[in-house]
């Protein structure tokens, strides 16, 4: 079962529809027991870093989604998308007083240039590491982005893909069984759907 984690951040139906092309065993949930029993997890989302972390940190029964996610990322394939990627870091300039999940060391910063913000539209992804999500996808293919902040991991070996928008920034991270994309694979045509298929097929 693939669990899409619902923390009131929107954009859940689009990733659910994309996953349904490859499996029907999907649930959208915030229930801790369901999340803990899942074979794979997806953390999507659009919105504000601080508001989202407050939702994730609220207790649901005996524990918070924050605690549940940090347990699960050690065991099963995990995919963070857009804001879901940024939440995996330790903190963000968008809401400096609110800690992130801390799964990956580093922070989230606002674009430091005069290019139009948000970075919105199609852009190429440079594959800097060979990871399972890239299988069947050529280098420098186009994916769809909508964001004003980007990740800045202190662990540079987790950077698997980069994109240039005024300067080069990380757009795909991979740490063990944790994967994260700044772009929206579910909105990125055939290449994005191939990436989702690759995630579904992970063991």
Swiss-Prot record:
UniProt subcellular location: Cytoplasm
UniProt GO BP: L-histidine biosynthetic process
Pfam families: GATase (PF00117)
Native source organism of the sequence: Methanococcus maripaludis (strain DSM 14266 / JCM 13030 / NBRC 101832 / S2 / LL)
CDD domains in alphabetical order: GATase1_IGP_Synthase
Matches recorded under HAMAP family: HisH
Domain Glutamine amidotransferase type-1: residue ranges: 1-203
Active-site annotation: 82 (nucleophile), 184, 186
EC number: 4.3.2.10, 3.5.1.2
Annotated protein name in UniProt: Imidazole glycerol phosphate synthase subunit HisH 1
GO cellular component: cytoplasm
Main location, first listed in the record: cytoplasm
GO molecular function terms noted in the UniProt entry: glutaminase activity; imidazoleglycerol-phosphate synthase activity; lyase activity
Catalytic activity, reaction form: 5-[(5-phospho-1-deoxy-D-ribulos-1-ylimino)methylamino]-1-(5-phospho-beta-D-ribosyl)imidazole-4-carboxamide + L-glutamine = D-erythro-1-(imidazol-4-yl)glycerol 3-phosphate + 5-amino-1-(5-phospho-beta-D-ribosyl)imidazole-4-carboxamide + L-glutamate + H(+); L-glutamine + H2O = L-glutamate + NH4(+)
Pathway the protein acts in: Amino-acid biosynthesis; L-histidine biosynthesis; L-histidine from 5-phospho-alpha-D-ribose 1-diphosphate: step 5/9
